[in-house]
């Protein structure tokens, strides 16, 4: 049986590993964390621990700040679409887990996209169509986020089609994931499914305050792992980086299917 000491040590190790994956390929912290934490704690407790590490690592990924303005000018409509799609999805369907068939269907789509990406085929979105396609992609990403809690589809595919440099792609993913996290958090808070509710489900009398404290403590291993992952990423060739990103999406897709 897991006692509290072993659970804390295991959670620290999980967030360190998840942060490393995040630093290397720009995504995967929620997936790795939830998959491994579920081995020794309830999903509600795992989700509560994940809140701040997910948000803060996405904010860190958005640096450097100087590059945000041109990125926002290019992706502003997409961010608006993400917010509207997420809030609308929560209002219409009731939030994450409300449509059980959505997760495996999304997983299958993600597997197909990852296999296509690993084949070496690529496409680019023409500049005149990037604004409206970005808004449409944002709406769809937001709607999918609302019912599955997954931010990457089809946002990552669209961002890859823009022909961004590797640093710009990492920053763009950080921006989109931050927008999605905040929008989903706002929607769940509105529906009464936020961190305080999760803490109450876990039987924690201190509710929101204790949940935030536990989540804040997991920031240390997550950020340390992310820094190490970023150092490893600098040693990767662009082609190897792209393959690792596609493999990460493939693993995420398989995880969602089951």
Kindly give the residue locations of the regions a language model identified.
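Structural signature of hydrophobic alpha-helical transmembrane segments
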Residues: 7-8, 13, 37-55, 100-110, ...
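Selected transmembrane alpha-helices and immediately adjacent juxtamembrane segments
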Residues: 1-40, 123-180
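Hydrophobic alpha-helical transmembrane segments in multi-pass integral membrane proteins
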Residues: 46, 88-93, 143-150, 184-187, ...
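Hydrophobic residues within alpha-helical transmembrane segments
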Residues: 13, 17, 52-59, 76, ...
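Transmembrane helix exit motif
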Residues: 58-69, 90, 96, 105-130, ...
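Selective hydrophobic functional segments
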Residues: 48-99, 182-238
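A helix-boundary/kink motif common to multi-pass secondary transporters
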Residues: 42, 97-98, 165, 237-241
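Cytoplasmic-side transmembrane-helix entry/capping segments in multi-pass membrane proteins
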Residues: 70-82, 103-107, 128-138, 168-175, ...
